[in-house]
Design a protein with these regions (language model features):
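Phosphate-coordination loops involved in phosphoryl transfer and adenosine-cofactor binding
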Residues: 1, 74, 149-152
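A short, aliphatic-rich alpha-helical micro-motif
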Residues: 39-43, 68-71, 148, 200-205
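Short acidic active-site motifs
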Residues: 34-38, 63, 198-201
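Short gly/ser/thr-rich secondary-structure transition/capping motifs
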Residues: 27-33, 57-60, 133-140, 190-196
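Short loop/helix-cap segments at secondary-structure boundaries that form the rim of catalytic
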Residues: 15-22, 40, 87-94, 184-192
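N-terminal glycine-/charge-rich "phosphate-binding" loop or analogous flexible N-terminal tail
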Residues: 1-56, 176
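Phosphate/diphosphate ligand-binding glycine-rich loop within oxidoreductases
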Residues: 45-130
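Rossmann-like dinucleotide/phosphate-binding beta-alpha-beta segment
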Residues: 142-205
Length: 205
């Protein structure tokens, strides 16, 4: 029976519930504060789910050569995010272990947050809030904000998150999009109606 092991907690517990309800899959949660029991479970694991954030994972659970020497049955490692800082991909590849990540899983949330911060700066929301809490009582004209409407927005990166920011700014605020991303195809720039530029020009504008 395939055995999936995950460390501590997962943000999407509904995913764990789905797997646990499959009678042909064994799902085991291990605790980072119980090394002996954890590695006993990992020794017979076929898949390991681990956070992508280095500061959230004790080094002993980083998937490197030392870790892999203790997990001989492993065939898949899954990173709980777009990154994979806790996984030595080269070491896994040498052993024929598949590494997967969750690219795009939080793109919508991050994109909306980025646009929210733009609006916060343009409308001076946080700045005004802090001063009001300190007793400021000046004229409202002192804090006139600016609109995002029809502004030119510069994006460094036009992947899952950057692309979604572009869509929100265009569809919601009629913005023009400048973008720098040397790894994205011209077709994607066209699809997102973004003007391709270099980093210096983007920062200048």
């Amino acid at each position: 029976m395939p055995k999936i092991v995950y460390l501590d907690n997962l943000p999407a517990q509904e995913g764990v519930s789905i797997l646990e309800n499959q009678n042909k899959i064994k799902v085991v949660k291990i605790e980072s504060n119980n090394l002996e029991q954890s590695f006993k479970e990992l020794e017979t694991a076929h898949a390991f789910q681990v956070s992508a954030a280095r500061d959230e994972v004790p080094k002993i659970f980083h998937v490197n050569e030392e870790f892999l020497s203790k997990t001989p049955n492993l065939i898949l490692v899954s990173s709980g995010g777009a990154g994979y800082d806790t996984i030595d991909v080269e070491a896994c590849t040498k052993r024929g272990i598949l590494v997967v990540n969750q690219t795009g899983g939080n793109a919508e949330a991050v994109a909306e947050h980025a646009v929210a911060l733009m609006l916060d700066l343009l409308k001076r929301v946080t700045e005004t809030d802090l001063l009001l809490r300190k007793g400021w009582s000046g004229a409202r004209e002192d804090f006139i904000g600016r609109n995002l409407f029809k502004k030119t927005v510069g994006l460094i990166g036009l992947g899952n998150t950057g692309g979604r920011v572009a869509e929100i700014c265009q569809n919601g605020f009629s913005c023009d999009i400048l973008a720098y991303d040397p790894y994205i195809s011209n077709e994607r720039f066209s699809k997102l109606n973004a003007k391709k530029t270099n980093l210096d020009e983007l920062l200048f504008k």
